[in-house]
UniProtKB/Swiss-Prot annotation:
GO terms for molecular function: oxidoreductase activity, acting on a sulfur group of donors, disulfide as acceptor. The active site is at 129 (nucleophile), 132 (nucleophile). This is Thioredoxin-like 1-1, chloroplastic. Keywords: Chloroplast, Disulfide bond, Electron transport, Plastid, Redox-active center, Transit peptide, Transport. Residues 249-264 have a biased composition (Low complexity). Residues 73-206 form the Thioredoxin domain.
């Protein structure tokens, strides 16, 4: 018994010798004498590190399961947030090759000017407009059925100032442009009145040749866009042709020359002959 107590004291002394500031450990000590022999492996405790031990030749890790669950939950939340942030917007779904979004007033003007004789449909929409969202799949179908027609999308929320200068105050709103005619029609419609859109495509969609240059936006609209200080757009108004003044009539117009009057002798002769 005395031997066991002394060995226990040695065991505790060994523990004291291996104590450090950031951990504590127990050195392996063997007990014997009573037919019982066990070995205690070194046990270490460190801040924010899992506990490790050796049990029958296998390594056992003691960790905080709550921390692990928290890390997994945080990773799942971050992945979910990333997926939501990169979700495709409704006005970007189903787009065709002849559909694109306008990013500036200059791009809108250039797109209409360079369209030539092609029919151009300008679609004014807003992300928060329920009617615009419901109508979008139909517009994509029309674009697919009419590959020769150019569809331009204008986001009202991103280009409010430009839409105000163009006089757009209702959504969804559409403008049709064609060659030298410029704007051929404009209207607002929903799924209930989609016939307006279908009829406009049928009327202005067939191929035709313009006799003049492509018009695009009207002169007053271009001037309004240039006057808008919030837009990075410049435009030089076309010179107004001066009408030629009408020729003023002469103050002394030429009058016909009167016939010479007959002399008194001739009159007497005629009277005498009559007698």
């Amino acid at each position: 018994m005395t031997e066991v107590i002394s060995k226990t004291s040695l065991f505790l002394g060994a523990c004291g010798n291996h104590h450090r500031v950031d951990d504590f450990s127990f050195s392996p000590v063997s007990f014997g004498g009573f037919g019982l022999k066990k070995s205690f492996s070194c046990l270490k405790l460190k801040s924010q590190k899992p506990l490790r031990s050796v049990f029958y030749g296998k390594q056992i890790v003691f960790g905080d399961s709550q921390d692990e669950s928290f890390r997994r939950s945080s990773a799942i939340t971050a992945q979910t947030t990333l997926r939501i942030g990169t979700a495709q917007k409704w006005w970007e779904k189903g787009l065709k090759d002849n559909m694109r979004e306008i990013s500036s007033a200059q791009e809108l003007v250039d797109s209409l000017t360079n369209a030539g004789d092609k029919l151009v449909v300008v679609d004014f929409f807003s992300p928060g407009c329920g009617g615009c969202k419901a109508l979008h799949p139909k517009i994509c179908q029309f674009a697919e059925m009419n590959p020769d027609v150019q569809f331009l999308q204008v986001n009202y929320e991103e280009h409010k100032s430009m839409c105000y200068s163009l006089g757009v105050h209702v959504l969804p709103f559409f403008r049709f442009y064609r060659g030298s005619q410029g704007r051929v029609c404009s209207f607002s419609c929903t799924n209930a009145t989609i016939k307006k859109f279908r009829d406009a495509l049928a009327k202005h969609g067939p191929d035709r040749c313009s006799l003049g240059p492509t018009k695009g936006l009207e002169e007053k609209e271009l001037v309004a866009l240039a006057a808008n200080k919030e837009l990075n757009f410049t435009y030089t108004p076309k010179p107004v042709p001066v009408e030629k003044e009408a020729a003023t009539p002469d103050s002394n117009p030429s009058l016909p020359v009167p016939l010479p009057s007959m002399s008194s002798n001739d009159e007497k002769t005629l009277v005498s002959a009559g007698r």
